[in-house]
């Protein structure tokens, strides 16, 4: 029987999920996105050629894989068409490989307008969203006024629903935020223009995945963003609008949770965060600059500079709990090359001297904490591109071993570069 594997981020996103998903898709028949939208940025490097995907699953470059956008994903038709065009120009037969759930909520222009208007209105208290309409689209879904992909297939009904929801949002834009209204006719025309094209790719995702499971075909579920950005379990309110944790797989695809066999947590060898929000181990110093520069820490979606810091084991323990992580993939180990010492956060100290080893449940709880850091010797040797454990210096091996001890979870994969070949698979999630 084939295994069903989840690959998800354990930090604030940008852990290197895209590369690992691409690597593991060689052994899977289906790759499924189950949450988020085109706010994700998954970078693949294959034989030196770089591909950045925001919405389409990272298995799209494999000719033996069907890629699925599940119902938990908020879908922006314009972003999807842009990505499809880019891939087709590279010779990728997207229509043969991509399938979409009719139940995906649509992101439409007024969602983006609202997202941008809200961030601007927040001023210094801005959350740091991508401005791509993700949050407003999820709001419409929960409020039961959202439009879904399947609504496009009845033009008359879609027009009626669109008029109603746009009247509501345009009122907010013009009267509350003092912004321009979004044009109804143009929005309607653009949406209906691709209805037939999308319909050709729509399937009952729940039924398809269940049949695949019964046939023993391996399925890989590709998470977006990271655990610490989860709407319920992240550093609220500095979070995304979806469940980025393993629980989102079932709700965002219709796949039964008891059928998941392995959860692979992607963990960078240090930590980064894009946008606002608490970050106890942040390094605003020369070492932070080193990590940011050597790690090329700029967002694949927004281009924003990421905030670097030491690896936070307190937060990673929470990720292990929430996701029932089977094993970790440690990425960007090579970025630590050349540092005299490396540090790991093992606790949060409060002003009264008390030390916590679990994360607070909201952003406010982080305001007065300072990280308790454990220091380990660094290494001068080059680990970039290493493909076997024997090539790693002893200090790097000691660092890996210490992380396994602290997290009580094995590190099953080690990544030492952006290319799919620059990887050590110690334990294969599909084996």
Curated annotation (Swiss-Prot):
Protein keywords: Cytoplasm, GTP-binding, Ligase, Magnesium, Metal-binding, Nucleotide-binding, Purine biosynthesis
Binding site residues for substrate: 300-306
EC identifiers of the protein: 6.3.4.4
NCBIfam families given in the database record: PRK01117.1, purA
Organism, as annotated: Shewanella woodyi (strain ATCC 51908 / MS32)
GO biological process, one term: 'de novo' AMP biosynthetic process
Subunit structure: Homodimer.
Major subcellular location class: cytoplasm
Protein name: Adenylosuccinate synthetase
InterPro entries cross-referenced by the UniProt entry: Adenylosuccin_syn_GTP-bd, Adenylosuccin_syn_Lys_AS, Adenylosuccinate_synth_dom1, Adenylosuccinate_synth_dom2, Adenylosuccinate_synth_dom3, Adenylosuccinate_synthetase, P-loop_NTPase
Binding note for cofactor: Binds 1 Mg(2+) ion per subunit.
HAMAP family found in the cross-reference section: Adenylosucc_synth
One GO term describing the cellular component: cytoplasm
Binding site for Mg(2+): 14, 41
Pathway the protein acts in: Purine metabolism; AMP biosynthesis via de novo pathway; AMP from IMP: step 1/2
Reaction(s) catalysed (UniProt annotation): IMP + L-aspartate + GTP = N(6)-(1,2-dicarboxyethyl)-AMP + GDP + phosphate + 2 H(+)
Biological role: Plays an important role in the de novo pathway of purine nucleotide biosynthesis. Catalyzes the first committed step in the biosynthesis of AMP from IMP.
Active-site positions on this chain: 14 (proton acceptor), 42 (proton donor)
Enzyme class: ligase
Gene: purA
GO molecular function: adenylosuccinate synthase activity; GTP binding; magnesium ion binding
Residue sites binding GTP per the record: 13-19, 41-43, 306, 332-334, 415-417
Binding-site residues, IMP: 14-17, 39-42, 130, 144, 225, 240, 304
Localization of this protein: Cytoplasm
Family, per entry: Belongs to the adenylosuccinate synthetase family.
């Amino acid at each position: 029987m084939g295994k069903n594997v989840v690959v998800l981020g354990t930090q604030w996103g940008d852990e290197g999920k895209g590369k690992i998903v691409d690597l593991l898709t060689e052994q899977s028949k289906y790759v499924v996105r189950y949450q988020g939208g085109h706010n994700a940025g998954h970078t693949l490097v294959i034989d030196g050629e770089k591909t950045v995907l925001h919405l389409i699953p990272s298995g799209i470059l494999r000719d033996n894989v069907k890629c699925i956008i599940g119902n938990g994903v908020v879908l922006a038709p314009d972003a999807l068409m842009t990505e499809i065009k880019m891939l087709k120009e590279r010779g990728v037969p997207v229509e043969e490989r991509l399938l979409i759930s009719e139940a995906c909520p649509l992101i439409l222009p007024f969602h983006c307008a609202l997202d941008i208007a809200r961030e601007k209105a927040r001023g210094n208290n801005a959350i740091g969203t991508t401005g791509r309409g993700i949050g407003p689209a999820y709001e419409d879904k929960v409020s039961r006024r959202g439009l879904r992909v399947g609504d496009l297939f009845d033009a008359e009904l879609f027009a009626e629903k669109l008029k109603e929801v746009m009247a509501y949002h345009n009122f907010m834009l013009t009267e509350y935020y003092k912004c321009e209204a979004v044009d109804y006719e143009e929005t309607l025309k653009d949406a209906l223009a691709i209805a037939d094209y999308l319909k050709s790719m729509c399937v009952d995702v729940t039924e398809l995945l269940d049949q695949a499971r019964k046939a023993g075909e391996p399925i890989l579920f590709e998470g977006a963003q990271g655990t610490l950005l989860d709407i319920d379990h992240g550093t609220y309110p500095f979070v995304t609008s979806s469940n980025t944790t393993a629980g989102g797989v079932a709700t965002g695809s219709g796949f039964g949770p008891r059928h998941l066999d392995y959860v692979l947590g992607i963990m960078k060898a240090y930590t980064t965060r894009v946008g606002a929000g608490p970050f106890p181990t942040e390094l605003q110093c020369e070492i932070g600059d080193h990590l940011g520069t050597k790690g090329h820490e700029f967002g694949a979606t927004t281009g924003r500079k990421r905030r670097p810091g030491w690896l936070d084991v307190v937060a990673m323990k929470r990720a292990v709990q929430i996701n029932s992580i089977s094993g970790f993939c440690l990425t960007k180990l090579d970025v630590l090359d050349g540092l005299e010492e490396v540090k790991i956060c093992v606790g949060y100290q409060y002003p009264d001297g008390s030390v916590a080893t679990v994360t607070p449940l909201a952003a406010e709880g982080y305001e007065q904490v300072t990280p308790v850091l454990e220091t380990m010797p660094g290494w001068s040797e080059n680990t970039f591109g290493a493909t076997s454990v024997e090539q790693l210096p002893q200090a790097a091996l000691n660092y890996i071993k210490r992380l396994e001890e602290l997290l009580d979870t094995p590190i099953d994969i080690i990544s030492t570069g952006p290319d799919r070949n620059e990887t050590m698979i110690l334990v294969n999630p599909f084996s």
